[in-house]
């Protein structure tokens, strides 16, 4: 069958491509030639509360291999995000809890409570009607057959 083209065209693994030979070699410590203010700014932008102290430690110990290993494991800190409500809790976010008031103390609050109860009852009734609106009944089925 022959040799696949991808195998023939790839260079041997021990030979680096020509564009890679001209590149600067990677350093284990990325902060080796950085200034203190640059390191502080980097930590501040990542949201670190102790940015100045961490930058000072890294700048002083730039040649230490333990610091280089710690920097590899360092991940960018993000402020905690507010999680969106789940589907099951989303409808509960619109519910209101009515504070209990004594009807004798404030006659206006009693009328407000009554009007709120009427409002909630009408909402429930309209939701029930909407739910039942599209349910097929025996008359709608016969109507479809005749036409």
From Swiss-Prot:
Q: List keywords of the entry alphabetically.
A: Cell cycle
Superkingdom, taxonomy of origin: Eukaryota
Biological process GO terms, please? positive regulation of MAPK cascade
Answer yes or no on keyword Cell cycle: yes
Region (Disordered) residue spans? 1-27, 99-147
Composition-biased stretches (Basic residues)? 121-134
Protein's UniProt keywords contain Cell cycle: yes
Q: Which InterPro entries match?
A: AVPI1 (IPR039579), Avpi1/C8orf4_dom (IPR020282)
Composition bias of kind Polar residues appears in 108-119
Q: What does the UniProt function comment say about this protein?
A: May be involved in MAP kinase activation, epithelial sodium channel (ENaC) down-regulation and cell cycling.
Q: What is this protein called?
A: Arginine vasopressin-induced protein 1
- What is the species of this protein? Pongo abelii
Tell me the lineage of the source organism.
Answer: Eukaryota, Metazoa, Chordata, Craniata, Vertebrata
